[in-house]
Amino acid sequence: MRSPIGSPLRLVSIAAVCLAAGLLSACAAPERLPDAQYTLSERQSLLLAPEQRLSLTYEGADDTRCPDNARCMAPGRVAYRFTLRIQNVEQAFWLVPGKPGFTSPALRGARVELDRSFDAPARGMIEAGPVSYPVVLNMYGT
């Protein structure tokens, strides 16, 4: 028995094919993205490839480190949230200090990672965490 045209499974399948086509279309781009270092503030975007509407947005940070005036069972960490956009397709990812970077077909073989010399701002007290979490990242062609 065939499923109706508007069935949820069929719509999900069509959406998945469109997503894959959008991300893989970046593979056809002839030029690599340049190696570069960027310093970004929260909610700041970079336009990486205007002809493809490829951008990277630093959304913000999640800080689970122990505040200075608290006792914690585990040390926690800072994780930086990003969104890669190509045309109308979005892909969210996280970068964490000391962990591998991020790659995607949309990045044309490039890798995004936190700069090794970058230190997160101090966590501060419970009531007064850092006002903002700037980030320094590197993009490397592979």
Predicted regions and their residues:
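Bacterial signal peptide processing site
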Residues: 28-30
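Short, solvent-exposed beta-strand/turn "edge" segments of beta-rich domains on protein surfaces
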Residues: 49, 53, 66-75, 123-129
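Bacterial N-terminal signal peptides that target proteins for export
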Residues: 2-15
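C-terminal partner/receptor-binding element of secreted or periplasmic proteins
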Residues: 115-142
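C-terminal motif of bacterial Sec signal peptides marking the signal peptidase cleavage site
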Residues: 23-26
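Mature extracytoplasmic domains of secretory-pathway proteins
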Residues: 56, 60-103
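Short Fe-S-cluster ligation motifs
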Residues: 95-118
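Post-signal peptide N-terminal segment of mature Sec-exported envelope proteins
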Residues: 33-55
